[in-house]
């Protein structure tokens, strides 16, 4: 149930799609780590890319497969979906680019990032691209310090309202933030409102780890990746402390 609400909530977010289309042009086939419901996967396939998506969440994989089954343009011919762990996958194939959109990379511990990079570079061709987007590390650090030092959680902030895909009841989406020992926990609260006044809440939580641009780049270098671009948004602006995102583009050169 929660997965369907998450998919509906994020389906309208498309600001990053031109970026992924542009940077993967000529870098087929693409491997997407954490493909989820296919928010990025399907548009890339529609743009003519050959793409493989990995995800551990079975419900998300099933949703994506159902979307492909209903598609009238034979997108399934350009998309392979695998239910597996992005840290330990074994694929007998080489890719021109590997991407990890949707801020997923910042949810990994340092040990997990090491495993992912070591595994990923085994299937990335020489001069292939690895692209990861994360929330601005300066913002994560400042927010963590504020919440941690004051021992507080943020108040839920109403983000949007949409119609439940199955019941047609309104769903209020709120978010709240809390400091953990090594990061920020981001809770999404999905409140389904019933006509009789009842409310049913679903919770989706993600934790973003404290890290820095410098550490990310050091990890890239150790994995045989040269950082070729450091961007602050999906329109290509340079990264600085006020950027909404940190987007790292690495080129395999070892």
Placement of each model-derived feature along the sequence:
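A short acidic, Gly/Pro-enriched loop at the edge of an enzyme's catalytic core
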Residues: 87-97
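C-terminal lobe and adjacent flexible extensions of AdoMet/dcAdoMet transferase-like proteins
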Residues: 207-254
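Class I SAM-dependent methyltransferase "Motif I" SAM/SAH-binding loop
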Residues: 34-36
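Class I SAM-dependent methyltransferase SAM/SAH-binding core
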Residues: 45-88
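SAM-dependent methyltransferase
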Residues: 132-214
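Conserved class I S-adenosyl-L-methionine
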Residues: 1-28
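A short glycine-rich, Lys/Arg-flanked "PGG" loop and its adjoining helix->strand segment in the class I
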Residues: 114-126
